[in-house]
């Protein structure tokens, strides 16, 4: 996926009220932009750090700018716009990049399912059945490791999705969780048990129930981002 129009650059001043950020562009313009990420963004919002943002020409938008990429203290790039993950996964699915899920004949997005009335990101239909696919965007990295982690904040919603997937798997339905690691320089991903032990426990229960866990990394520049490789999933002791 190419960023269109081209992204603009700036420096982060502060993120606040979760969905807002003040930045200074390279031309010296002070802007308040939208932050499309509900997480803590633990290594992606360093004051003074470089950011890239898109600008909309839609006159109805209150904030024309949207934060897209951060440079982390480790020098990595992170696509912090969580809304991009599903687009990237759909592109990769249609291009056959995600080999474990090849062969589908139809793809549907945002399908209602489960006892807790969740909406799954994708339903893929095959000649012999179907599967449900949930996608999580990962941006949490560490200075001393090439292993990313999820989540970066406590996520009851994420645990609910795992319970729903586990229920499907127990009923004989193929259920898949895919971590889209939107962070450069990463070789694997793991559950962030130190941040959300309840999520880590729910993930283990989902795996035991038969949920398939996949992880894929991206090629990311300020010009484009796309899924390009399979990553390992590491489990805490």
Curated annotation (Swiss-Prot):
One of its GO terms (molecular function) is DNA binding. InterPro entries: SfsA (IPR005224), SfsA_C (IPR040452), SfsA_N (IPR041465). Belongs to the SfsA family. This is Sugar fermentation stimulation protein homolog. The gene is sfsA.
């Amino acid at each position: 996926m190419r960023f269109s129009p081209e992204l603009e650059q700036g420096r982060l001043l502060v993120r606040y009220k979760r969905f807002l950020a003040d930045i200074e562009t390279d031309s010296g313009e002070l802007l308040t932009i939208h932050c499309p990420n509900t997480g803590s963004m633990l290594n992606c919002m360093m004051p003074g750090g470089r950011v890239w943002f898109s600008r909309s020409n839609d006159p109805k938008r209150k904030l024309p700018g949207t934060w897209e990429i951060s440079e982390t203290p480790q020098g990595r790039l992170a696509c912090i716009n969580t809304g991009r993950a599903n687009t990237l996964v759909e592109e990769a699915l249609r291009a056959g990049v995600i080999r474990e899920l090849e062969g589908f004949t139809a793809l549907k997005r945002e399908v209602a399912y489960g006892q807790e009335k969740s909406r799954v990101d994708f339903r893929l239909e095959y000649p012999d059945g179907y599967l449900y696919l949930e996608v999580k965007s990962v941006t949490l990295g560490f200075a001393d490791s090439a292993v990313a982690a999820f989540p970066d904040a406590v996520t009851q919603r994420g645990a609910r999705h795992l319970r729903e997937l586990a229920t499907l798997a127990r009923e004989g339905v193929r259920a898949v969780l895919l971590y889209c690691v939107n962070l450069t320089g990463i070789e694997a991903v793991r559950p962030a048990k130190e941040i959300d032990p309840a999520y880590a426990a729910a993930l283990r229960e989902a795996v035991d129930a038969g949920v398939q866990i996949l992880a894929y990394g991206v090629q990311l520049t300020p010009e484009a981002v796309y899924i390009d490789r399979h990553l390992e999933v590491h489990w805490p002791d």
